[in-house]
Amino acid sequence: MPRLFRFILFAAIFCGAAGSARAQYPFGKNKVIYQGRNWRVLQTEHVDIYHYAPDSTLILYLAPLVEQTFQEYSETFHLDFKRRLPFVFYATHYDFQQTNILPSLISEYTGGFTDLMKGRIAVPANGSYANLRHVARHEMVHAFMLEKLHRVMDDRGKFTYGQPPLWFTEGMAEYLADSPQSPQGEMFVRDALLNSRLYHLDEIWRIEGSYMMYKQGEAILNYIGTNYGKDAVIRILENWWTASDFSLVLKNTIGVDMFELDDGFQKYARRRYYPSMLEHEFASDLGKQLTPDGSFYNRPTATIGPEGETDICAVTARDGRVVICSGPRTEEGGWHPDVLVTGGRSGRLESIPAFRSKIEAHGDTLIFVAKNNARDRLYLWSRSHHKEIASWRFDGLTMLQSPTLSGDGRRIVFSAIEARGRMDLFLLHLEDGKLERLTEDGYSEEDPDYNPHADVILFTSDRGAGEDLNRTHIYEMVLATREIVPVEGGPFADTNPDWSPDGKSFLFISDRDGTPDVYLHRPDGVVRQTNVTTGCSVPAFMPDGEHFLASVYERGEFHTYEFPIRNPAHSLRAPLPPDTLQVPWSRADVDPSSFVTKPYRTKFGIDFVGAGVAIDPSAGDIGNGGQMVLTDLLGNHQINIIFGTTTEDFSSVLKDFNAAVSYTNLSHHLNYSLAAFHLNSFTDRVFLSNQEKRTGGAFALSYPLSKFDRIEASTVFRQIEKINPATLAGLRQRESITGSVYLSAVRDNTLWTYGGPLLGWRFYVTGGPTVDFLGRGFDSSLLQFDVRRYVKLGPRVTLAMRYVTRNAWGGDDLVFYLGGPWTLRGYPYNEFLGRTTHLFNTELRFPLLDGLRIVLPFGPIELPMFRGALFFDAGRTSRNTFSVLDTDWLGTLGVGAELNLGYAPVIRVNFTWPTDLVTIKKDSGFELFIGYNY
C-alpha cells in the first residue's frame, strides 16, 4: 500500500509545521503565530487561568469572575468537579485567532470555545467587560455540561454516549450565562417568528451553528425554564443515561417529547411576541429599503460625490468575502453600488470587519480599518481611483475601530484595543502621523464620532454602568481639555452616536423600550426616529440633514434603509439623567496576592488515539495500524505517533511493521518538526515486485508570510534498501544512504463552498535534490508545480482550472502516476506512469437541485444539494528511459453529478468519453468518486 501510507507518514511528519495546512496538504491557509508568549498560570481555588497579559487589570477582573461562576455553576449543575478547570485567556481576539488548541482557523466572529477532548476553555478579551463576562460564563456552561454528562454516564458504567443536539447545548449556555434574553436576542427570535423562519426542532439542523440557532436555542431553554422550572434543564442531563434518543430523555424528564416540546414552544413564542408586534411598525412603512433581498449590508455612510450627488458606502459580503462598496443614489431613488475595497485576498487586506467598526466617507476619501497580518491598519482610500492614499499601523495597538475624521480633515479619532486588552480612544494627526492617547482607564470607549464644526467627539462607554455591565451611555469629550461629559444615560444601552451635518444634534441607538431603535438627541430633548418590529443599528446622517441611513435586521438579513428625520414637537422626551462616572464593579479592590501565579510548564496529554484497516484496491495491498496524538495544554507542542503495517496478506503483518514519530513546535512564527521513521515493505507497480525498507530522520521548517502565503524547507536522511528484480539480478545496487533537501512555496486564498473551492487561487511549488552519500545510483532531483484557479461565473457557478506537473531526474526510480478520478478521469487508476507528468483539468460546476426530500415508511430523508459538472482533462507522461512507455497527449470529456452533504466529502459519479485529442470514443465510462473536488 505505497501511496496511502507514504501520504499518511509524510503528512504526520511535515504538515504539523504548516499550521492549518495540515488538513489540505499541500494547500491550506496559515495560522500565524506572530509573537511568542510568556505564558503563566494564575490559580484560583478551582480554576487555572493560563495567560500572558502584560496588564493585570483584565486578569484581576477575570479571576474572581470565573471563580464565582465556578461556584455558582457547581450549585446549578449539582456537580463537584474532581479536576481543576483549565481556562486559557487571550488579551485580544487576534491573539485568540492564533491559538493552537484547535487546529482549524478561527473566524473573527467566534467569541470563544470549549474543546471536547480536554475540557479546555479559550476566551479572548475584546475591549468590553460585558462581552468578556458573557463569553466566559457561556463557555463555562459547556465545560460543566461535559463534566456532568461524563459523571452521570460513568456512575452507571456507560462510557460511550452521544452529545445533546447543538441547539440545546448552545441554547443552554446562552440561557444560563445571561438571563433574561438580551434585546438583540429578542430581535432575532421576533424577526424569525414574524417571517416564518422560527424552525421546528426536526428542521433546526438547517441553521446548524448559526447565530440564529444560538438565539432560538436560548429561547427554547427559556421556555423550558419558565414552564418546567430552571432545574429541569439540569435534570435533562441527569437523566441522560435513561435513553439514547434525545426525545425520550425529554419525555423521561419533563413529560413531553421533542415534538410536544416544539409545539409548546411555538405557541409560547407566538403568545409572547405577537402582542408586541402590534406596537411596532415595519421598516418599509417608515423608510425606503436600498438593498436587495437576499443580501447583507451594514455600517452605511453617506457623503457628497464629485458632481454633487449623494454617494453611499457600506460594508457588504460579496462571494464569501467582506468588501466595502460605494455608489451614488439614482434619480429613481435607488442605489446600485460597485465594489470599492475587497478583503480576504492578501495579507495587506486580510479581512475587513463587518460589524465591529464603522466606515466614513468624506468626499472622495474613504476611511476604514482592516487587518494587516498581526494587527489592524488604518486606511485612507481614494474612491475615484480605487487605491490606497495613505495608511498607518501603530505599535502596541492591535485592533482599531470606527475611525472618524475632523471637519477640517486634519485629524482622525478612533478607538483601539491595546496588546494588553483594553479599549481606549486615540487621536491621529494626519500631517505628521503623530498619535495622541485621549483616554487611559479601565473603561471601554468605542464608537467615536467627530463633530463636523468643533473639536468635540461623542463616544460610547461603560463608565457609570455600575455592576450592570450591559449598560452603555453616550459621552462627549472636548479635545482641548479632555473633559468628558455624560450626555445620555439610564438603565439600558445607548450606542453608535452620529453627529448631524450642522453639529447641533446627533442620532444614536438605544434599547430603552426593549428594541434597538434610532433616537435623535436635540438640544431641547430626544425624539424617537424608528419603532420597527425587529431592530436597527448604526445610524448615519445623510448630507442634507433631513434623512438618515441605518441597518435594519429583517427576514434574517441586514439591509440598509433610508429614513426621514422626524421632528414632531409632541414626541419630544426630556433627556434621561446621566449616571455619575463611578467605577464599574470593584476591579481595583481585588487583592492580587489572593491568587497563586506560576510559570507555565509543558505537559503532554493525549488528544487522539485511533486505529483502522485500509485496502489499496489498485495494488491489492492491506494496511492496518494506529495513530496517537499528544499535545500540551496550549496545543503549541505536538507529538504524533503512527504505527502500522503494509503487506500483501495478513500473515506478514508483523514482518512488515512500520512506525514513525514526530515532534512539532508551533509556539513561534517559525514552526519546526523533527521526525524519525522506519518504513518497511512498500510495493510499487514499476516492476512486478518492489519492496523498500527506509529508516531515518527528518527535519522541517515552515514560515508563514501571511494567512495566505508560506515558505517551507525540509531535509530527510534515510538508509534505504530496495528489493526488486533489478537489484536481485545485480543490475542495480540494493542499499545506500541518502539525504534530501526540499524547498517549497505555497499560496492559498481560496474560499470554499460545499464540496470544493468557490473562488480564488492556490499554487504549490517544491523541488530539491537527493544525494546518494555512497555513490550507488540513488541520486535524484525533484520538481513539482501545482496551480489552481477558481472563477465565480454566477451564483454558485464556478469555473475550476488546474495544471500540475511533476518531474524527477537522476538514478533513482521515482515515478509519478496519472489516471483515475483524482487526476486524469476516464482512465483506470494509475494507468500511466512516468518521470515527468503534465495534467490539465478544466471543469464547470453548477447547481442541479437545492434539495431532495424522499418520504419513506420510516420517515423522510432530506438530501441537501445536488451539483453538476462539465469537464475536460488532458495529460501526458514521459520517461527518460523506456520511451516506449511514454504517452502522447490524452484527454477526457465528461459530465458529473454529485451529492453534497454539507462540508463532508461529496459523493460523485462521472460519465467519461476518453479522447486522443483527435477522436472521441463512442462508449462512455463510469466512475464513482468520494472526496473533495480539486
Segments from the language model and where they lie:
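C-terminal transmembrane beta-barrel domains of outer membrane proteins
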Residues: 621-683, 693-700, 711-717, 729, ...
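Short loop/turn segments that connect beta-strands within beta-propeller blades
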Residues: 328-331, 382-386, 429-433, 478-482, ...
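Active-site-proximal alpha-helical
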Residues: 167-168, 172-182, 190-259
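Beta/coil-rich, acidic/histidine-enriched accessory regions frequently appended to metallopeptidases
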Residues: 30-33, 38-41, 208, 235-238, ...
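Interface/linker segment at the passenger-translocator junction
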Residues: 567-647, 654-659, 706, 863
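Juxtacatalytic substrate-recognition/specificity segment
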Residues: 23-159, 163-165, 249
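A flexible loop/linker signature enriched in serine peptidases of the S9 family
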Residues: 295-297, 315-325, 329-332, 344-354, ...
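Residue-level detector of Asp-centered blade-edge/turn motifs that repeat once per structural unit
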Residues: 306-308, 361-363, 407-408, 452-453, ...
